[in-house]
Amino acid sequence: MLYIDFEADRKAYKLRLTTRDVVALEKRLGCNPLSIFGTGETIPSVTQMVAILHASLQTYQHGITYENTLDIFDNWLADGHTVTDFIPTILDIYRTGGIIAPEKRNVSEAAEDEKN
């Protein structure tokens, strides 16, 4: 999959990190994007989450500013989500951008997909 679908305030967005986006994100975060999880016992800050969202919007939503991204994140929260609900989205963004490996599926799921 080249992107993930994301919806806020009934508007659809495509999220993906390219190498260019990852480099810009590293500069904004001041660290490797994986470092935001620390040793696995911390959650990213809202600032980090919005930075990831902003970087991942750049490929398919040309012209989205950081200020626009703040509004998109607010709209997503207003849709009934919580800040911690965004963590799986971050992981999906990282998977499509090649930062982490895709989830491994079991053999029966792969076989079922091939049938369809």
Predicted regions and their residues:
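Short linear motifs in exposed loops
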Residues: R16-L17
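An amphipathic alpha-helix signature
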Residues: V46, V50-H54
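Charged interaction scaffolds used for protein-protein
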Residues: M1-A12, V23, K27, C31-T42, ...
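A short secondary-structure junction motif
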Residues: A55-T59
